[in-house]
């Protein structure tokens, strides 16, 4: 009999439930009650798990409650000499005895009571098992998970730039401590750009603005004197890659409506970059759906606003027969465009019942139709191929209602107004387009004309443009000075000096697409005093010209260096300006204007990604204008070690998250603005002079920043340091920068600081990367973060 009971006991030893949240949550030996044989009272909190051993020898011991032996399975169980309660409830209170098998000797005699004064274990306060003055002994517990159900998500896959939070809520008595490991090594975040936040009271680890280098296994280790438990999370950071908008398949969908009803067409757009969305309706002009060049006529029904959330839905109220036809959702960003189409069928009201009956009848014969259509599929395909070939020869355009029609004929859309013969004006907007080949010849050698659609809002007559001397050039493009007659419509006989961007003869299709993309981006962004504005385009009967504002005084770096005061350590690269040195308010004004331009670009959801003094142009009236904000830069193909044509290293203007992980945001532009501030107050100095690139990387990771330039007030240096905070979220916004610089402008006057004084021993003319940095001439401040509080109204940088 005893043998049979022993065998049954062995088979029943498998737990019916587990106190662990995963296989990685280690089970430690359970504690024994404090005393043996003597009666003991333990106070337990509601919801707390209980695990007690019956003496030093667990074999041959059984637990009883109120005289009844506990089963070896269930929420409350006694097995292998252990008393286990998964979650303590009021009905679990009472007297428990541990008896030795055979002799029935009382090994333990204890009473469990629930103390309502104790916080529930559901409370996230880890001090659940604090001491009490009631005289009762509180249950000593090895660490345990209080909310294992919240820890079930092991894999966290998030886009770069997001915030990640790992939680391991636990409790125990004595109160356990928590430590974090990354890939098996102690993790304190000291080498992570932006640092980490450890919230021990919430058992959590928080990392802001994650980057691909944050990938790995993160383990929480919770321990006290009675044991330890651990749990691991896997973090995968998905690197953002620039791409054109993605449209959800099947949307917009074909729709059938009745005259007088309302219709909604939905277009779901996914895009990292701010998309520009248009709803288009295909229309007929003079009996034709297509122009002479084969491109469709399209009416623009709805266009996105910068803050619009309703543009993805096209609402058609009280539809009529004229509303029937093909509708297209067109979405574009700085990378490219995507579009999908659907058909709207409008039925007369009296045909509604007939249509329903017909649809029901058709559904009954669906199977028959499928079989028949399958047998005729080959014949139909041959017929369609013949019809298509005939249409291609004769230029006949036939339209068929399909669920999604990919209109490859107008990937680049332009809007213009159709002039009516009767009134001279029309509210009807048309879009026509051109296809850029991605499979044709790689070069546009000998290009003399480009078949781009006419855009009367921006088209400028080519014969009124006289090209002059080159202002700058790259491998495949160039900028020339030009004279434009009648650019100002109010003064048609006046000539204006402009700058014209164009392609060289050896430009590729990709270069052409980039120039068109820049042109479209400038159209979408609009006008502002502190950016280079688009004035017009030449797209007809010749090469593509993009006409922009002309800046007579060149870029800001040259402007600053030409106005350096005389001295042994400051000398201009070229001829010294006759206008003399700049005053301190003039320098602050330069920074203020650039900040205003960047604030506007930020409001238009435009990330510059290459903000530097060389990309800020200066007009004849000393107005700062940000340039090259519409360029489509391939950030995944940047050679970070390659110098630019003028010898400067782009990496020196890049934020750490952009430099190391290629994450570009408005806050990475703020970092670059801080470098630009440094350029301004060194009068065009080269950042990090004498610092090799390899050393620069490690210095930035360690938190080192450039020291204060000579004659730069501590307030403005504090502003630079705020821009250089390691955590992107802790940097100021451009709106805050504009407000801070505006206050400085109001406070200063011409007598505040005269830069005609000779500068200190620092020379910004040092080499960029050829020499090494010694301790005596280092431009780095070796304190990782500001030593004094920021005078500006945004969060102060904190040491990480």
Swiss-Prot record:
Keywords: ATP-binding, Cell membrane, Disulfide bond, Endoplasmic reticulum, Endosome, Glycoprotein, Immunoglobulin domain, Kinase, Membrane, Nucleotide-binding, Phosphoprotein, Receptor, Repeat, Signal, Transferase, Transmembrane, Transmembrane helix, Tyrosine-protein kinase, Ubl conjugation. GO terms for cellular component: cell-cell junction; endoplasmic reticulum; endosome; Golgi apparatus; plasma membrane; receptor complex; transport vesicle. Residues 389-800 are cytoplasmic. The modification Phosphotyrosine is found at residues 640-641, 752. Residues 465-753 form the Protein kinase domain. It is found in: Cell membrane; Endosome; Endoplasmic reticulum. N-glycosylated. Full maturation of the glycan chains in the Golgi is essential for high affinity interaction with FGF19. Ubiquitinated. Subject to proteasomal degradation when not fully glycosylated. The active site is at residue 610. The keyword Nucleotide-binding applies. One of its GO terms (molecular function) is ATP binding. The keyword Transmembrane helix applies. The chain crosses the membrane at residues 368-388. Residues 17-115, 148-236, 245-345 form the Ig-like C2-type domain. The modification Phosphoserine is found at residue 571. This is Fibroblast growth factor receptor 4. It comes from Rattus norvegicus.
